[in-house]
């Protein structure tokens, strides 16, 4: 059997061996060559994007509570009031059963003051709803000299709007003095109270 002659000479084999690493390096996948390089972000805007700082959330319920509180306070603000000086005389006997019973325990002045306080409170409501226009303005008073001398004087803070209604009714021309107006107002309040007392009995 004859000896085969190598297909490559020694020199060609050395050149091939030297060129093989370059060929291997040249055929490496692109992904392998670039794996060591830093990858740029897919979106350039993401590079500078940082999470926004947390902002403390306000509780809407607390804000609503404060608004409701402010509204409640403003809605309950008391109207402006002005002091009115009042005077009245005791009723004649049998005009008011309540008064006749009170004078058995208290003086006529004290008894009338107790009733007048209640009567003025009721009369304010009548001024507000307009029912005072059809109410009586006076009541019988005692005719004896000793009883005629009795007069009760007091004062009361009246809401300005209601006071204007009373002035237009009892002093439409604006000519009455303050005390004369106060006497008319107190007398009308007592007259309405005494009339209501009789209606209740029925």
UniProtKB/Swiss-Prot annotation:
Arranged from A to Z, the UniProt key words for this protein are: Crown gall tumor, Plasmid
Q: Please name the Gene3D superfamilies in this protein's record.
A: VirC2, RHH domain
Respond yes or no to whether keyword Transport is given for this record.
no
- In its keyword annotation, does this UniProt entry include DNA-binding? no
Q: Name one GO biological process term.
A: regulation of DNA-templated transcription
Q: Show the Pfam families listed in the entry.
A: VirC2
Q: Where is this region: Disordered?
A: 24-65
Name of the protein: Protein virC2
Species of provenance: Rhizobium rhizogenes (Agrobacterium rhizogenes)
Q: Specify the taxonomic lineage.
A: Bacteria, Pseudomonadati, Pseudomonadota, Alphaproteobacteria, Hyphomicrobiales
């Amino acid at each position: 059997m004859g000896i085969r002659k190598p297909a490559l000479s020694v020199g060609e084999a050395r050149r091939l061996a030297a060129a093989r690493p370059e060929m291997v390096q040249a055929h490496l996948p692109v992904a392998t060559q670039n794996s060591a390089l830093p990858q740029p972000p897919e979106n350039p805007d993401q590079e500078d994007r940082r999470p926004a700082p947390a902002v403390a959330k306000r509780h809407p319920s607390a804000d609503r509570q404060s608004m409701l509180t402010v509204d409640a306070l403003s809605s309950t603000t008391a109207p402006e009031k002005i002091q009115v000086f009042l005077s009245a005389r005791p009723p004649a006997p049998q005009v008011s059963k309540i008064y006749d019973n009170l004078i058995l325990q208290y003086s006529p002045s004290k008894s009338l003051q107790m009733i007048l306080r209640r009567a003025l409170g009721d009369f304010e409501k009548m001024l507000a709803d307009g029912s005072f226009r059809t109410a009586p303005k006076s009541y019988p008073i005692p005719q004896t000299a000793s009883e005629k001398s009795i007069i009760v004087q007091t004062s009361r803070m009246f809401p300005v709007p209601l006071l204007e209604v009373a002035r237009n009714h009892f002093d439409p021309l604006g000519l009455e003095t303050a005390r004369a107006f106060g006497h008319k107002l107190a007398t009308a309040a007592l007259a309405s109270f005494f009339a209501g007392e009789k209606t209740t009995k029925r």
